[in-house]
Curated annotation (Swiss-Prot):
One of its GO terms (biological process) is chemical synaptic transmission. Residues 485-511 are annotated as: Disordered. It comes from Torpedo marmorata. Residues 1-36, 130-135, 187-197, 247-267, 328-337, 385-400, 450-511 are cytoplasmic. It is found in: Membrane. This is Vesicular acetylcholine transporter. Involved in acetylcholine transport into synaptic vesicles. One of its GO terms (molecular function) is acetylcholine transmembrane transporter activity. InterPro entries: MFS (IPR011701), MFS_dom (IPR020846), MFS_trans_sf (IPR036259), MFS_Vesicular_Transporter (IPR050930). The keyword Transmembrane applies. Belongs to the major facilitator superfamily. Vesicular transporter family. High expression in the electric lobe of the brain. The chain crosses the membrane at residues 37-57, 109-129, 136-156, 166-186, 198-218, 226-246, 268-288, 307-327, 338-358, 364-384, 401-421, 429-449.
């Protein structure tokens, strides 16, 4: 009797849980709600990637000093015989400071390894994303980042830390590119797309700026492995949430997917090249200042450890303000995205030039805040422009174009940790900042080249020029039919029939 009641109760609970799961699944698969959840997943992935990138800033220098700057040497101690001769000798091992361990070079290479591998991987990951979609690469990226973070937590040698850092670069090439491309794909209306990309940029900024104090506090009070385990746990949860929303390895119902434009064609597009150059240029000051500003603060203003630790934290708020202002302006005046980017470059240039003039911590906060405000203007204005350019000039598949954007960022962050210290040593901190500021100001007029982009419409003549090969898929076949239709004097009905015939043929072929 009791067993039967227990079974009945378990059956009711199981059916209730199943019904609840169906409701949750149905609610999550509602199109507008689903894209919001996907935006949250992408933002968490961006947050994790940038936190992992910056969390090692207060941890690695101190940790490397303990594991790399000492070497094991053996000292031979002679023992005298009774007649004064050396009969025996004993050896003992001691730790001696290693004069050949160049910590600055080691740290610079470790920091740059992530961006270098990301830079090398992006051409391939962009093409892969164009072929398979956005969800599988995002899941691959989160998986690689999870294992990279775990390796960081328990790695105890420079070689293992270097491998973990490089592995993170590969994960970022998948996760960052597919995440941004997914946002561009889900949010097709320009104002919504700009807003969604702005939210993602806010999470990127928050991750970069909050990670150093987060890592420093946990490292000091809980040990090296704790901050990395926290990040790996969040990464695991983000991957599980992604699997709940999408089914990346389920059988694909869409047989005829659009074929993305090869990345080499996008790279030689003059408009995309101008945008990519602006993204690299605006991030150079940040990438070159991060490894050099702490030493300069210590020498110039005798800054304390906590001041050097929170140098970039106040800049988070003007960065968010810059994102918000650009989103609002883009919604009201969408034709001036190029102008917002140009203003941002000028602000970055002026801020970079004024940093060496600061003589105390309070003064330094002002140009750093202005610098991040300008970066927010450039990024928020130009990232949606890349998707718009692909929409009007190519096929609306965004993996390769955002791989180019990721390459632009990676160039700056690959060169910064390696070159910045040497430039400061050879030329000086003042000359470094003046050079970076001048480059940004001189690049700003180049964005005038983009002033007519928003008036562009997809045109058959432009497609004729850009599409050099014959039709390879449904989209290009229809485009070819439309071209023929445009050439015929009374081709409206026949053109429509031809397109329908193409659709019928494609459907019959897929069956």
């Amino acid at each position: 009797m009791a067993v039967g009641q227990a079974k009945a109760a378990m059956g009711k609970i199981s059916s209730a849980i199943g019904e609840r799961s169906k409701r949750i699944s149905g609610a999550m698969n509602e199109p507008r709600r689903k894209r919001k959840i996907l935006l949250v997943i992408v933002c968490i992935a961006m947050l994790l990637d940038n936190m992992l990138y910056m969390v090692i800033v207060p941890i690695i220098p101190n940790y490397l000093e303990t594991i790399r700057t000492y070497k094991l040497v053996y000292i031979t101690t002679p023992s005298n015989g009774t007649n004064g001769s050396l009969l025996n000798s004993t050896q003992r091992a001691v730790l001696e400071r290693n004069p050949n361990a160049n910590e600055d070079i080691q740290i610079g290479v470790l920091f740059a390894s992530k961006a270098i591998l990301q830079l090398l991987s992006n051409p391939f990951t962009g093409t892969f994303i164009d072929r398979v979609g956005y969800d599988i690469p995002l899941l691959i990226g989160l998986t690689i980042m999870f294992f990279s973070t775990i390796t960081f937590a328990f790695g105890e040698s420079y070689a293992i830390l270097f491998a973990a850092r490089s592995l993170q670069g590969l994960g970022s090439a998948f996760a960052d590119t597919s995440g941004i491309a997914m946002i561009a794909d889900k949010y097709t209306e320009e104002s919504e797309r700009t807003q969604a990309l702005g939210i993602a940029l806010a999470f990127i900024s928050f991750g970069s700026l909050v990670a150093p104090p987060f890592g420093g506090v946990l490292y000091q009070f809980a040990g090296k492995w704790v901050p990395f385990l926290v990040l790996s746990f969040v990464c695991l949860l983000d991957g599980i949430l992604l699997l709940m929303v999408v089914t990346p390895f389920a059988s694909r119902t869409r047989v005829n997917t659009l074929q993305g434009t090869p990345i080499y064609k996008l790279m030689i597009d003059p408009y995309i090249a101008v945008v990519a150059g602006a993204l690299t240029t605006c991030n150079i000051p940040l990438a070159f200042l991060e490894p050099t500003i702490s030493n300069w603060m210590k020498k110039t203003m005798n800054a304390s450890e906590w001041q050097m630790g929170i140098t970039w934290l106040p800049a988070f708020f003007p960065h968010i303000l810059g994102v918000y202002i650009t989103v609002k302006l883009a919604a009201k005046y969408p034709n001036y995205q190029w102008l917002y980017g140009a203003v941002g470059l000028v602000i970055i240039g002026a801020s970079s030039c004024t940093i060496p003039a600061c003589r105390n911590f309070e003064e330094l906060i002002i140009p750093l805040c202005a610098l991040c405000f300008g970066i927010a203007l450039v990024d928020t204005a130009l990232l949606p422009t890349l998707a718009f350019l692909v929409d009007i000039r190519y096929v609306s598949v965004y993996g390769s174009v955002y791989a180019i954007a990721d390459i632009s960022y990676s160039v700056a962050y690959a060169l910064g940790p390696i070159m910045a210290g040497q430039i400061v040593h050879d030329l000086g901190f003042v000359q470094l900042n003046l050079g970076m500021g001048l480059v940004n100001i001189l690049y700003a007029p180049g964005l005038l080249f983009l002033r007519n982009v928003c008036q562009m419409k997809p045109s058959l003549s432009e497609r004729n020029i850009l599409l050099e090969e014959g039709p390879k898929g449904l989209y290009d076949t229809i485009i070819m039919e439309e071209r023929k239709e445009a050439k015929e004097p009374h081709g409206t009905s026949s053109g429509n029939h031809s397109v329908h015939a193409v659709l019928s043929d494609q459907e019959g072929y897929s069956e």
